[in-house]
Amino acid sequence: MSIDLVPRQISLRWFLSLLERALAIVGLLTFVYFGGFDLSAISSHSMAPTLKGESLLQGDVILSERISYKFRQPRRWELIMFRDEEFYIQVMKRVVGLPGETVRLDDKTQTIFINGVPAPRPASLQGIRYLAYGNLTGGKGVSSDDGYYVLGDFSMDSQDSRWTGPVRPSQIMARPWLIVWPPSRVGFVNP
């Protein structure tokens, strides 16, 4: 009779050990996700072609990480996710001007000037055309004050700093990092 109990005890121990490991992994992943990451669906085309979206169900799904900006400030040309305080939504845009800088756009040459000096774009952004709308019209410079001047990559239809002003550091939530859906678009989002 004791011979029959041995396989059951081994089986139960093996199962409990497996369950313990599985729960530890799920707990760790839950902690990491809620502590450091965010999943967001893109529902507009204001950041196309970098991020695409037509509706909540037909847009890129983005994994953003919240850890980087606890240790460093956003860099020029990076994407940031921030809280729009007027509409209480999460928004993703590209950083063009850093705190204390003046941003100007030459609409003809597509050159962005920072404090009067041309700001070269990364090669991956050469095809993006920014339009001198809102506070960038007439070739005038706009101060980012103590915030970040952001633009949407699809400049023709983007609610960005040209209309709403700079993004305050306290509004920044995360750094969009990876397109995780759809499979045909999986990849990193920053240059």
What are these regions (language model features)?
Residues 2-23, 31-191:
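Soluble "head" domains of membrane/secretory-pathway proteins
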